[in-house]
């Protein structure tokens, strides 16, 4: 910024004496930008909070209504098969409600920046095998869950539970959207990072929706149970671990969800 002062002005003598003062306002502009960003962040946080409360009101009420409603009907049911159907519906909605509460707690920790990362030595092959064994029992007969052959030996430092959480979310989503075919758990070493992936032969995702699925409360199919928070939480976890997350998909052919992690 330049301020110009006229010290002596005598037009009859064709004299004008000026004083120019140059001010460095770099720090002022930097502070101004910081304040603008802080304001925008606060406004965005307020918007997300309102959206969060509106969505949670609906998401919590849905399984609760099912639990309360079918619990009442269970008392009146006389047929054993009918009772079994009601119990199954109640159990499914209990699981959905528990998952929703778990996601809310994770999300609140992320917002408060208290989302702890506990580093330990992780065996990549063992991690994927544990997931494979746990999810095999939950896979329908029409779908084959696979663990990629000849996985490379790899041990690195990370938060094992958080890595498992991300991979579990990928496999769970793949099972929801794959009615037949196969789902493959894989990882490959690429330079100084490892790339984990879960590939399925499911319904696939439209190109315009692929970026949005990592946004909170975005659900590809409102008829399939889910909170719409899982992938958003996965993105936050992967970012905190120093990696990247993404998806490659083609409608009608399937999807491949992946994330990278630095090897140290």
Outline where the language-model segments fall.
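Short loop/turn elements at sensory-signaling interfaces that couple input to output
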Residues: 2-18
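Sensory beta-strand/linker motifs that couple input domains to effectors
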Residues: 21
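Primarily the dimerization/phosphotransfer
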Residues: 32-74
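Short alpha-helical segment of the dimerization/phosphotransfer core of two-component systems
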Residues: 92-98
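Helix-loop junction within the histidine kinase core
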Residues: 108-119
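Short conserved segment of the HATPase_c
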Residues: 205-217, 257
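Short alpha-helical Gxxx[C/S/T] motif in the catalytic ATP-binding
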Residues: 230, 234
């Amino acid at each position: 910024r330049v301020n110009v002062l006229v010290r002596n002005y005598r037009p009859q003598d064709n004299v004008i004496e000026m004083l120019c003062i140059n001010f460095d306002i770099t720090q002022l502009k930097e502070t101004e930008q910081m304040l603008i960003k802080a304001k925008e962040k606060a406004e965005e946080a307020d918007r997300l909070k309102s959206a969060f409360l509106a969505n949670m009101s609906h998401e919590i009420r849905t399984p609760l209504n099912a639990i309360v409603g079918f619990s009442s009907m269970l008392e009146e049911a006389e047929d054993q098969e009918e009772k079994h159907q009601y119990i199954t519906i109640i159990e499914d909605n209990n699981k959905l409600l528990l998952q929703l509460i778990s996601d809310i707690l994770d999300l609140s920790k992320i917002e408060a920046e208290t989302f702890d990362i506990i580093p330990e030595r992780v065996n990549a092959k063992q991690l994927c095998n544990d997931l494979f064994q746990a999810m095999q029992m939950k896979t329908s007969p029409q779908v084959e869950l696979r663990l990629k052959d000849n996985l490379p030996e790899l041990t690195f430092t990370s938060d094992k539970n958080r890595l498992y959480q991300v991979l579990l979310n990928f496999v769970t989503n793949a099972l929801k959207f794959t009615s037949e075919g196969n789902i493959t758990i894989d990882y490959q070493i690429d330079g100084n990072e490892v790339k984990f992936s879960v590939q399925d032969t499911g319904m696939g995702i439209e190109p315009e929706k692929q970026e949005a699925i990592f946004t909170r409360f975005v659900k590809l199919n409102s008829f399939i149970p889910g909170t719409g928070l899982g992938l958003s939480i996965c993105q936050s976890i992967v970012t905190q671990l120093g990696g990247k997350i993404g998806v490659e998909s083609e409608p009608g052919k399937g999807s491949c969800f992946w994330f990278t992690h630095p090897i140290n």
